[in-house]
Amino acid sequence: MIPEPSQDEFEEGYVDANGVETHYWERGPEEGRPIVLVHGGGSGADSWGNWKYAMPLLADAGFRTFAMDMVGFGKSATPDPDAFDYTNQARIDQVIGFVEALGLDRPSLIGNSMGGAASMGVAMQSPETIDKLILVGGAGHLTPDERPQFSRDAIDTLSSFDGSREAMFDVVDVLSETDWFDKAAMVDHRLSNLERPGIEAAFAETMRIATGGDMY
């Protein structure tokens, strides 16, 4: 089992990214080529849970790595759903704003699941913003022929989450290969994220929009 990294080994900051107060973790040499890591979804998701194992490896390879919390997740802002559209476009704009706010010179993007869809959007809408695009299980739109083949188990598990620890184990199971890290620690971390005001309402709206046709 891979050892748990300590948050003391990372820098932590906030920046205004297209009007969204955005929390992020940073690690790696200041002179290194920048990489922005964009996390996936699911109840209680955030950049730390998604990227804490990858960031030290990338930093040790000489990259300056940034892992941002998407709007409505982690320690980033959770605007009232009545006044904010939790769409993929909002996340695309947040990523572009994050790169601009930190003055990063054409970073590479690594996006997972929901974050993969946002990263693809950045590459399509603002290709001059980034250098390379790497997708890890990136979400996206499905054609009518593809929809019946798509696993409903994952969507049903995410959308039916009831706040219990047992249900969070199901969420982690459906999103991850769980035999190489401490699954209980990940479950507890994601549950602790749900204690922040506005997180659950933001996630419910994100899922409502995603399952209604804007599949990330």
Cite the ranges covered by each PLM segment.
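Catalytic nucleophile serine of serine hydrolases
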Residues: S76, S113, G137
